[in-house]
């Protein structure tokens, strides 16, 4: 049955490609124009929410722990900081409108009112890029430098490393784990507890990072769009069979390298062109299999797009233009290498 669903999905994409601009379809799949795939994005959002909750909860456990009775001033500052984090969490991650439609952790989005989906769609990206999530990701980046020690709960980083401060939370240097750990007021049990808190804080931050890194995109849909668009356009451009075959046979690169493409996409500030640029770059870098004939065919395909746009007196989408320029530049490099 699942296979039949995928076939119908591909048939729908094939039909849609005939009637829509391919780049617009690409934008829709990526979600760069506000469209999101709820079946992918909602579970991702929940994972981020859960890991953020765990991160703040761990700090709350530390604040209430008996070991902090020895550090009255630090305890007060940590209590205020945790309160601010909880307030931010409530503001960013409470979506009871969708949650009330969950049954056994699953949501039938066909039953969710459109206004609820639209509200979530509008707010989703600002939530996962919020100051709270950014703070935790920066905390993760700091702690990841000491990954091996923390995962082994090795106190080396709090005892031997140079410096007097080990503060893993940006903008909150008052939480100095090195100071807490090395205090004469602590028993060995207290020291072990502090190291355990640091370990749990890191694993929760890693949970946020791993959830953020989940693509918002169905890679198979993206592959189908590329293949369907190629099958449509190659009927209109004769004598470019080898170039089209090269594109079609290289679609596997999209799936193979997609996590890297997606990381670049997020790092670029969600510029959707990045994914296609990196994909075409990977195709064109296989210079052993790109003969002068195939290079010429690629140029013919590019010229077709340019002529089609000029005929319709349209201004080329800047993102498409950048993509075309990138391909042309790569082809020029390959031509020079073969001379």
From Swiss-Prot:
Induction: Expressed in the late phase of the viral replicative cycle. Keywords: Host cytoplasm, Host nucleus, Host-virus interaction, Late protein. GO terms for cellular component: host cell cytoplasm; host cell nucleus. It is found in: Host cytoplasm; Host nucleus. Interacts with host NACA (alpha chain of nascent polypeptide-associated complex). Belongs to the asfivirus H339R family. This is Protein H339R. It comes from African swine fever virus (isolate Tick/Malawi/Lil 20-1/1983).
